Regions:
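Active-site donor/metal-binding and catalytic loop motifs
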Residues: 134-144, 369-385
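Cell-envelope/extracellular polymer assembly enzymes that use nucleotide-activated donors
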Residues: 150-155, 189, 357
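Donor nucleotide-sugar recognition loop
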Residues: 330-332, 337, 342-360, 365-374, ...
């Protein structure tokens, strides 16, 4: 049975060769995926996409007796290997080797020893000058009775991200939906909720792609609409067994869907409720992993295996070490349909935290696997003041239901830390949004149920900082100062700096000594604003920015509002948290969502 295809770098997907194979000499690929190998040269496939995590396949699935099928020409030594993580590094072991020869491209099969574990892979060494590798696959044995029926319903929520969405749909059409040779053919349908209402429905809709207009009610509302459409399709016999929630601004290799499908098809009965999570890799640096599963930690998020360079073999092996997962973000998360019930839909919290809450509520076991991933725009490309309203508000909502130890005092600590962090950056509007988010949480679940989320979001967006072309701002952009500011925090670490900051409240108790500075919009630290009058917050991607200014009046106003909010927390937190804990079912039912999304009209 096919386990994993051996993948190639692809223009438009990922061109980082070392995620697929490693060789010292420059690689020469002909059209049609043929890798020419110079005599004496060795190619290793102990890589993120082209190795097999045997331990996970054995633990979670019925897969047994792994084998390798390769298309080769010329004379080559084929070496079957494994790697294990021992004492903080991976250790290579040779399991078997064989010399093969063919005058033209020929298919060869190789069996890994029974019981082979760890990360399985192979190496090729060219023994002639005309050697070539032309692809292949890993296979396994599995009894027919152990293969379960699986059909995946892809749930995409989009808001004006046409290039990404259209590209991913086109790839799914050509590789799967309209490709009868694909194992996933007839086992995949795509459901798109168009929150921006800008897609061409007549052009996109078909028997297997379903695009519907939706109100702009954030990711929570968009993904929930997709779930509702999938439940409706199942009533008409669609037979979807798993809902794959997937962001609209990702790049997807469709083989990831096939690996997910195979994993689910072979899963053991005791893992019927397993979630499959895809890792997030950076779109701008495609070998760098942002997250591979995560823990909530009462809002102090822990992104597992963050910043792993997956071209490093030791990190590929370490990436498969299992940790305690509480959720997987919804850039790629596959959920059993048994979980997606009419009485168990997401919370209507618009954005930031809907995936976390749903995972905390439902994810008993999350499986991640090397090679199951998407490439996503880095978060530093997405600065928005509006997030300051949602992040802390939704943290409070999520903790009310899932972390009873998070009390009024814990919230006051978080509020003070975040508000003063923004005030010390002169970002007073962000501080206001943090406070407003907490005050809205304190109104309890009735407020959430009755609020027009789309109108509220427009108001929040209008209030925050808006980036403008820098030539329209009164602080000129200076690249040398921008570069200095990105390193300023590192240069000024130490006891003297810390004492200076504390004694002067980050410079508020002493006069400014610099007229202005230029900082990174996303990565600015409070120390960047130390004794500066004006700050240009600059985004290098858009080459836009906004200016904030030191103001003791604004400082005092924000501190007063924060202290007033803390008093409100003392008197209102317990009742608000209790309302979410006891009545959350009211806002995650199908009846509620139909009304919320105006689907009853």
């Amino acid at each position: 049975m096919l386990l994993q295809k051996l993948l190639w770098p692809r223009v438009g997907i990922c061109t980082e060769d070392r995620l697929y194979y490693r060789m010292k000499a420059p690689s020469f690929r002909d059209e049609g995926d043929i890798l020419r190998i110079e005599q004496g040269e060795r190619v290793c496939f102990d890589t993120y996409f082209n190795s097999v995590s045997a331990d996970k396949w054995r633990r979670y699935t019925a897969a047994q007796n792994f084998s390798l099928r390769l298309k080769l020409s010329g004379k080559l030594r084929v070496v079957l290997c494994s790697r294990h993580f021992i004492n903080s590094q991976s250790v290579r072991a040779v399991l078997a080797e064989k010399v093969v020869q063919a005058d033209s491209v020929q298919e060869f099969c190789f069996d890994f020893p029974k019981g082979a574990d760890g990360m399985l892979f192979f190496e090729l060494q060219a023994l002639s000058g005309n050697a070539a590798y032309c692809g292949g696959a890993y296979e396994c044995d599995a009894a027919e009775k152990d293969v379960q029926p699986v059909k995946i319903g892809v749930d995409i929520c989009t808001f004006r991200r046409e290039p990404f969405v259209m590209g991913n749909i086109a790839r799914m059409r050509s590789d799967i939906l309209e490709n009868a040779a694909s194992p996933l053919h007839n086992h995949l349908e795509v459901f798109v909720s168009d929150n921006g209402q800008t897609l061409d429905y007549d052009k996109l809709n078909s028997d297997t792609v379903h695009v519907v207009p939706n109100a702009n009610v954030g990711g929570a509302g968009g993904f929930t609409r997709g779930m509702i459409e999938i439940l409706k399709a199942n009533e008409n016999g669609a037979g979807v067994t798993h809902v794959l929630v997937m962001d609209d601004d990702i790049v997807l290799d469709t083989d990831v869907l096939l690996r997910t499908y195979t994993l689910l098809s072979l899963r053991k009965p005791e893992y019927a409720d397993v979630f499959v999570g895809g890792a997030m890799l950076r779109l701008d640096r495609p070998n760098i992993q942002v997250e591979n599963g995560a823990a909530w930690n009462q809002g102090q998020l822990i992104s597992h295996k963050a910043n792993f360079d997956l071209t490093k073999v030791d990190l590929c092996v370490a990436n498969e070490l299992e940790e305690r997962h509480e959720y997987n973000a919804w850039w790629y998360c596959c959920i059993p349909i048994a979980v997606v019930r009419p009485d168990n839909l997401p919370m209507p919290i618009f954005i930031r935290g809907d995936d976390i809450e749903y995972g905390l509520r439902n994810c008993k076991r999350l499986v991640t696997l090397n090679g199951i991933c998407v490439w996503h725009e880095p978060f530093e490309s997405k600065y928005s003041s509006s997030m300051y309203y949602y992040i802390l508000r939704n943290q409070c909502i999520d903790n009310s239901m899932h972390c009873p130890g998070y009390d009024a005092n814990a919230l006051k600590v978080d509020l003070r830390s975040q508000v003063m962090g923004e005030v010390n950056r002169y970002r007073y509007k962000n501080a206001d949004l943090l406070i407003r988010g907490v005050r809205d949480f304190l109104k309890g679940i009735d407020w959430l149920e009755q609020t027009d989320a789309e109108a509220l979001h427009k108001e929040i967006m209008a209030y925050g900082y808006k980036a403008q072309p820098v030539d329209q701002l009164d602080v000129p952009f200076d690249y040398s100062r921008y570069l200095y500011a990105t390193k300023e925090e590192e240069k000024n670490k130490g006891k003297l700096k810390n004492l200076k900051v504390k004694l002067t409240r980050n410079g508020w108790l002493v006069p400014p000594t610099r007229e202005n500075t230029v900082v990174s919009m996303m990565h600015m630290t409070a120390y960047n604003a130390y004794r500066v009058q004006k700050v240009l917050n600059y985004d290098s991607n858009s080459q836009k920015g906004f200016v904030t200014e030191r103001s003791k009046e604004e400082y005092s106003r924000c501190v007063r509002e924060m202290k007033a909010c803390m008093k409100e927390i003392d008197t209102q937190f317990d009742a608000a948290a209790q309302s979410y804990r006891e009545r959350c079912g009211e806002v995650r039912s199908l009846d509620f969502w139909k009304k919320y999304l105006n689907l009853d009209k």
